[in-house]
């Protein structure tokens, strides 16, 4: 979710192209998840291990506003129990641009089952609320499916260089 914004619905103030203050509605988790990919490429390596890659580009652009380009690649090796997500986010605008990015998805069996783990280069992990705080010690390990499960959300702060790049 994101890219310009990735939080709860609300209002945001900004300076318009005429220099006046403007206001816009912020949608739940931003716009990017509702924008279809404009370019999708599927490749399969011809030699072992025959890695499969799906790569796509999504543009979040607004007239007199953000011009963000996101390339996402998901890859896996047939028969493996892992996959990799690799993103490249580029500001195509003429001005610096803030961005937010949330990774959340609803995967099920056989990809995620009880005991599956999330491996991340995390400097810090913080629970989103008091409910999540009760499960912070096992933030990286998935439990079994449970009827009526109340979501448990953690903020992952990845290691970054001096410029904030992760």
Language-model region placement:
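Surface-exposed acidic/polar loop and edge beta-strand patches at domain peripheries
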Residues: 1-78, 82-84, 107-147, 155-166
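Generic detector of well-ordered alpha-helical packing
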Residues: 87-88, 105
């Amino acid at each position: 979710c994101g890219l310009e914004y990735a939080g709860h619905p609300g209002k945001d103030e900004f300076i318009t192209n005429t220099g006046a203050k403007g206001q816009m509605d912020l949608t739940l988790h931003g716009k990017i998840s509702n924008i279809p990919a404009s370019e999708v490429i599927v490749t399969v390596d011809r030699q072992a291990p025959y890695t499969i890659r799906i790569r796509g580009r999504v543009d979040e652009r607004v007239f007199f506003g953000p011009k963000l380009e996101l390339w996402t690649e998901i890859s896996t090796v047939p028969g493996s129990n892992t996959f990799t997500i690799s993103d490249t986010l580029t500001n195509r605008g003429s001005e610096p641009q803030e961005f937010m990015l949330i990774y959340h998805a609803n995967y099920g069996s056989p990809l995620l089952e009880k005991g599956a783990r999330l491996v991340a280069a995390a400097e810090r992990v913080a629970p989103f609320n008091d409910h999540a705080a009760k499960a912070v010690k096992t933030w990286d390990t998935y439990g079994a499916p449970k009827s009526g499960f109340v979501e448990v959300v953690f903020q992952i702060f990845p290691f970054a260089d001096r410029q904030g790049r992760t």
